[in-house]
Each structure stands twice: as structure tokens, then as C-alpha cells.
Amino acid sequence: MKNLANIKLYWNENDFLIADMLLILKLSPRSSSDCLLDLRDRKWELVCCKELNIGNERNPLNVPLFELPVNSLELQNSVSNDMFKHVYSQNVELNHKTQVDFTEQLIPKKSLNKLNGTLRETMSRMPSFESISLSETSNALDDSCFNDDWITIESEFSPPIDRGMTLEAMDSQNDTLFTSKQLNNGPNFPVEKATFFLESNMGLSQRAAATSTTPVCNISSVTSAINSVGEISNASHSSSTSELPCTYGNTSSIFQVKNEMSNIKSAISEGYIAHDQQSKKVSVQNIKKEFLIPFEFSLEGGFLNYNKTFSNLYKVLSETEKTRDSKVWFTFRLVLKTKPLYASESEFYETKLNFFTFPLECAINFHIDCSCFDDWRLFSLKESSSVAVPIPKIKKESGRSMFQSLLFQFNHCIPFRLSWINYKQSQLNIILTETTIRPRICAAYQKLEYNILVLLNEKPSSGSQLILSASPTCTIENIYIENTRLHFSKSQTPEQTVISFIDVQCVKVTEATKTLELSVILSERLVYETALKLPVIKYVKGDNRFCFKQLLEYYDIYLKFKLLADWRLLTNPVLQIQEISDYCHFKLLKKVNRNLQIKTNYPTQEFHLLRPTIKILQISKHEYFLHFSSSYIFNDARERDVYGVKLSKNMWISWAYVDNCEANFFCKDGTYFFRTTSRKQILLLEIGILIKPERYNLFKYRVYLPQFLPPTDSRTLVEFQTIVYTNSTLLFDGSFYFSQNGGFDFEPRQNYTYFDFKSEFIILQNSYSIYGPAKNIIKLLLELIEVILNVNVSTTAMCLLTLLIGIYLILQVVFIYTN
């Protein structure tokens, strides 16, 4: 048994990101309260919290996924009758769902109603949230075949896949899916946003042996159930109520819509959507009323706590259950919202959701890309981390405190699966690709084995190519298609591996309309404390040159982890889907110091930095080379001739380019200035910087990011106070620490480190500009005045000292201009 969190992401009409969560946790009834969520950063706002009373049977929600036995795929490219088969099809009933009365059970797409403090969100009659198990195993499987930690990222618009369907039937089904007015409750609904289904398991213990049918909580009107052999079946609500840990899919039984519609007491919060039953239109309600948290929950200090003494479930528990050490299953429905603020359509939004279930702490990072591809119109979930990080327990031994190790076992973290599902099967050759990762312990070292399963619309012919994006250290163990003998050759480059099919022979005649299953098995040796690039099939080139590039061409997938060689443990794995096109977005914001009233005739020009990238190369043991490139965007096209970059004392600029032309630059007081006479609104700046970090201990270095000053007139210099980094995330192989003075410390582990971050640089800038070296005198004058104000001297003495300093300043200015 395990703790489980089902998380569903979608967007509402007001561009709020909604996280609808179902938490099934095993908590001790002896404790009075438990902390569920950490909302201290105020990025997520609580919309709804509700405890689901599902009866005495409190079995957690389990979705078994099985890994493939190694001996199931023969390594000689031959075929056996006992060959392992994969089931990708659902029952026909899912393709022909019954008619749904929208007025009684469902609300149109992306609509929200709050009923008695409970937010009820339902989807239209679309095949959403069918979490497809892509494996079939024999009944005789031990515990080692279970997959404890796995991630499924699935588009809401994925129709059910039937192996026996023809391509024409798939195409017609897709057309019906995306053009039906009854389905979308209106004219052609634009496929502009998608829902992702993320399942993460937060448990430490392994799952018990395979049981009977395990239900899946589902929002749709038909509850999907995945049995122990990986098949997907349907069960009515009446027949599966006794087995379901929660009736999450039965909206009428949980929320009692008909009874509660007449007892609406709490209004809809600001920015949410109400539904007009008569006109069937969605309208925005701007009623400003706070959400009333139920008595069994409390929001204190940014933490959402669950108070058992106020819950209905706690009241029905017997006194024996309340006092004993055994835990009881609790089920919660939590709905959160956040407002991603994009400065442009190419910006990223990143947020984190923290769960607390002692002794586990689980953090899920969402990195959402706002850009859309050609016809996908798809918001992509770029980064997800579903790893439960154990909080160490402290125990006393021999009079001293010791930390008890609660690290994950090797097979607790992996294998897991990452699935990409395409909803336009008839247009692309690749329907689905799935990667299963599992450890293999050899005599002298450890390695990871990747099993990539691909669903194809057509069989590869002789001369076809399969392009695999993988690390050069990956070794191809086997390529297999059921009932087919393959002869292939490969050519490998640092970026990709090209597999050319020489001869494709069909051993057993099969129906040409069935989808084909291609298996590619690779292995890679583990290296201590490194980041491995996960292999991904990006193209299958044939006569029609179909590809899956809309989803996979722009991404490299990495598995970051630390390998403890002594204990053979895999800790803190993070799945990252990282974009290949090196761009991110941040902007420079000016905050004027209102205390200074000095005027100037040369104001600075507002600008933005677009798509800045920073790459760091280690050229020697204690020297680094930083390559920075970015685009300056201005409000107008006036002539600009000076750009300033302020560097720390241990950094030097070696070369600079402006608009792909070598630029002249000069240094003054640690600030480098570049001259240009261009009148463009967008200028590209590239600089190369040599760095010799300050080594302040044995392992870590200190490096300061360059400060980019606004472009000014050649006669104007701007005095900056400090630079502040907010909402910054740096992804690289190593640990980093921000310091208070704007720098960051990092520990390099590789010769090449890539910094991919989305930051908002806030420059605290004074509202005055000063001529030439007089700025230093003004700065000194202000410092002296500040010192004088802190000393107990008479007013006369302070005035005399200020007068003397003013006379000295005037003489210095006259001397400068006369020379």
C-alpha cells in the first residue's frame, strides 16, 4: 500500500492554471492534525478542500504498471510463440460512450461551480484521464515486477487506441472527436489548451502482490479500471462502488448536485466561471467573497492543516482505532489555482507544489511553456518531479543524536515510464512512444536499461531509418518488432544515432490494419553523480517521411540523480524535459529611488533583454569561460551608442559582437561600454567573459552574474545601487547557492555546465545621472552626509562641513571642464 496523489492540470477561461488533486494518505488517527500543503510562497491559492468519506474500505488508489522481464525479449532478433505481448487497446465501450445529459450531470468544458464550499469541476464528454497501461504480463509475477514510481503525461485529447481499428476508422473518429457540436457543447471548440494527467506516488514501501481489479478514479461518466494484467475495462458506478477507494468519477454521488444546487451558500470567488443552465454559456463572476474553509481544515502560516478532531470520519472511528498505532486511509480533494503572468508568448512559467506527509516531503515542479506548435495548440508540461524526499528521523543512541537513513531503495525510484501520446494517429507515423527505465546490477558496475516502445501506423520498410536521440555512451542491445525479423545497421554521432533497416521480413502474416509495436532496448553505464540523457526516438523516416517532431523534436530528456556507490542507492531522481533551443526570457525592471530629487536632462532608455542564455565552459582547473548572448529590445529606434556591462573584479571580457559584427569596447571602473550607431529596435549582443572564481573553501566557487546597464547617451553614466534576482531557477549538474549580494555559488561537476534559467532581474536604480567622474564625488558627498547624520554634532558644525564640501565640489567640476 502506498500514499498516492492524482494531479490534474487544466486552464480555465481566465487563464488560471487549476490543479485538481486527489490525495489518498495513510495517517495516524492518534495525531490531532497533519500538514498537507505548503502554500507559503503564495503562488498557489486554495480554491477548495474537502474530505471524501468513502466508507470503511479505505484501500489506496493503485494503478499497477509492470516492467518488462529481461528474458521476455530475445536478443537474437528471432520470434517465439511465447513472446511478450503489449496491449494498447481499450474496450470498445470506451469508444461508444452513452449520451450524457449536460444539464444534470456535467458542466461544459472548463467551467467551475462552487457548491457549499466545494468546487465541482467536470469535463465534457471526452475520453479524458484514461491512464493507459501499456503492458501485459503473465499472472505469475512477483513483487519485483511492479513499478513503484512512475509518471504519466497524457494529453486530454488523446482518443482511445484500438489495435483492431483501421486507419480510416481512426481518422473518422478523430474528425468526430474534434468537430462534434454535441461533444463540445458549441461550435468547433479550438484545441488550444490541453490537460495533463500526472500521477506520482509518494510511498516508501513496495506494493504488495498483484490483486484483483484495481479501480482508477476518473472524472468521466464511465469509471475506468485497470486489472492485474494491464487491460482496461469499464465498470458502472453501482457495481464498482464497493471496490472503489473513492467515487471520484461519480460526480452525482459525491457532490449530490441536485440536492446541493438549491443550497448554494458560498459565492464563486473572483476570477472563476459560472454556468448558466438555460443559455449554456460561460460567464465570468466578479463577486469578491472569500472561500470558507471547512472546519476540518485550517490554513495557518501558509500551511494547510487537516484537523482530525473536526472531521466526520474521525467521529465514526471507534475508540480502539483512535488509540492504536495502525494508520487509517484518508482521502482528500484539493483544488488550487495560480495565475501565470507572461510578458510574452515565449515566456516560461515555473511553480512548485509542496506536499507534506510525515515522514515524506514531496515537491512537484511544473515548468510550463506558453509557446504553441503548428497545429497542436498544446501547452507542454516541461518539467515534473514526483520524488518523495524523506525527512530524516532523529533517534538517540549511546547518548548522541544520529540520523536514521530513509533513502529510497534502488528499485523504489526506478523503473518508471514516460509516455507521449499523439491524438492525430492518422497523420503521423508514430502514435505513441514510451520509455521504461530500470536498473541492472552487473558484477563490476551498475547500468540503466532503457526499453523504448513505439506504436507505428505502418511497418518500416527496407531502407527506412529510425533516428534516436541518445547519449554516445548508450549501447543498442536489441531492436524488435513482433512477428518480424529485422536486419539493421547503425551510425552514431554525439547528437543522435541513425538506425537503417536493411531487410525487414515478416515471419507471420498479420492484419495490415493493426498498429505495430517497435521495441528498442538500450543500456548505459551509470557514472557517479552525473546526469544521463534519456534516449528518445524522434523520427521514423519512411516513404512518407512521417515524424513525431511536433512533440519531441525540440526536447532533450535528462535523468538527474546521485548514485551512492557504497550503498548502491539511487536518490533524488528528477525527470527533466529540457528544450534544445537555448532560450528563456526575463526582463529588467527599473525601480526608482523616490528619496532623491536630482533632475537630469539625459534620462536612461527603457529596454528589455529577450532570450538571454548563459553557458559556462571550464577551460582549466580554476578558470571558466562564460558566453552570454541576448537581444536588446527598445521602445523606439533612436540612435544609441553606449551599452554598459558591469563585471566583478575577477571577470574580463575577451570579445564582443553587436548584430554579428565585432564591437569596440572600453573599460572604466569595472564597467565595459560598447559603441554602436545602429537605429534598430532589436540588437543582438554576444560577449565572451573570462572568469577566475574566488575560491573561499575547498569545493565551492563564487561567481557573480554580469549586470547589464541600460543603454545611455555617451555623456551620461548611471549609478546603480544593487541588483536583485527573483524567481530564478538554474538547471545544471551541481549545487548552487544564492548569496545576498547578488552572486551565486556553485560546485562544478563536469567540464561543461549549462545554465538554463528564467529570472526577473530587478535593478534598483537611482533617478539621476551624473557627468563623468563627478559621480564619484556625489557618491562620496552622500556618504559623508550619511555619516554626519549618524554623529551627534551641532547643527552649525554640520552646516559648515556641508558648505565646505559643496565649495570643494564646485571647484572640482570647474577644474574638470577647464581641462
From Swiss-Prot:
Swiss-Prot/TrEMBL keywords: Meiosis, Membrane, Transmembrane, Transmembrane helix
Transmembrane residue ranges: 797-817
UniProt key word Transferase: no
Presence of the UniProt keyword Transmembrane in the record: yes
GO-annotated biological processes: meiotic cell cycle
GO CC annotation, single: membrane
Membrane topology: Single-pass membrane protein
Protein name as it appears in the record: Meiotically up-regulated gene 45 protein
Location in the cell: Membrane
Function recorded in the entry: Has a role in meiosis.
